Design a protein with these regions (language model features):
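Short, well-formed alpha-helical segments that are part of the catalytic scaffolds
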Residues: 12-24
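Short beta-strand-to-loop acidic/aromatic patch adjacent to the donor-nucleotide binding site
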Residues: 88-97
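N-proximal low-complexity "stem/linker" segments adjacent to membrane-targeting elements
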Residues: 1-14
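Short, polar loop motifs at secondary-structure junctions
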Residues: 12, 32-39
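Short loop->beta transition adjacent to catalytic acidic/histidine clusters or analogous donor-positioning motifs
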Residues: 2-3, 24-31
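Active-site-proximal specificity loops/subdomain of glycosyltransferases
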Residues: 36-87
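C-terminal catalytic/acceptor-binding lobe
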Residues: 170-252
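Conserved catalytic core of nucleotide-sugar-dependent glycosyltransferases
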Residues: 99-185, 247, 251
Length: 252
């Protein structure tokens, strides 16, 4: 089985490079950088940049309308693993503000959940087409037939079968659509296996019960500095935008 870890970023950060270099398991380690120039080298991490115009013209666009740039790093990641190198059986996609609690977490989660086509936080369904319940439902209108499904996918694992179905969608429509709807919806539409591991349930935003572990500052939530006892092995946490805390809290 051939697997990859793809960390999505604007540009490399030493914390993320170190994390990828130290990850356990037999993975290709890829950092997909949205900027055209990287200026970083590593013996075990491959740094990939993709020209905006090429990605857009090939139909890999519109995956994240929440950011001003189109194509986004997500569009480029789909372009790379759907067209440039579709050889991987499984690919982990991880945004740079996701904190992975251990260098063993990905291989451990892979071992637990086996051959699912999509590992993600949730798989919420809408069947009636009413878009008032969630701001982003409108992004599915005229892009895919009902039912629609959603999940935060800032950390997710995708199979070769699902990547092929995403490629088929681009080939037929010459576009993508909002990532938090598209990935789950295409998976479910094609009767693929979607699993929501407990290890991904700390991917926010969602309500917290008991002790607060996030703070709201300057219009955004982020994880506050706290005791290492709050970090659970194999869990993924989002958002943690202070990259220095990744090194501080990582268990090994």
């Amino acid at each position: 089985m051939k697997s990859a870890i793809c960390l999505l970023c604007v540009e490399p950060h030493p914390t993320h490079v170190k994390f990828l270099e130290n990850i356990s398991g037999d993975y290709s380690k890829i950092m997909l950088c949205d900027r055209s120039s990287v200026g970083y080298t590593s013996d075990s991490v491959e740094f990939i940049t993709i020209d905006d115009h090429i990605c857009y013209s090939e139909g890999y666009k519109n995956m994240n309308y929440c950011v001003p740039k189109n194509p986004s790093a997500w569009d480029k990641a789909m372009y790379y693993f759907c067209k440039i190198d579709p050889s991987y059986d499984y690919v982990w996609f991880i945004e740079d503000d996701v904190f992975v609690s251990s260098i063993h977490a990905l291989s451990n989660v892979d071992n637990i959940y086996g051959h699912a086509d999509l590992l993600c936080k949730e798989n919420t369904i809408i069947t009636d087409g009413h878009t008032s319940g969630w701001t982003h439902w409108t992004q599915a209108v005229d892009r895919h037939p009902l039912p629609w499904y959603i999940s935060m996918i800032c950390a997710c694992r995708v199979s070769k079968s699902l990547l092929q179905k995403i490629k088929d969608y681009v080939d037929n429509n010459h576009r993508l659509f909002f990532l938090e709807i598209m990935v789950n919806t295409i998976a479910m539409r094609n009767q693929l296996i979607v699993v929501n591991p407990i290890e991904l349930q700390k991917i926010m935003p969602s309500s917290e019960v008991g002790k607060r572990v996030r703070q709201y500052k300057h219009g955004k939530y982020t994880w506050v500095q706290q005791s290492i006892d709050h970090v659970q092995p194999n869990y993924f946490y989002h958002p943690m935008k202070d990259f220095a805390l990744h090194d501080k809290f990582r268990l090994n």
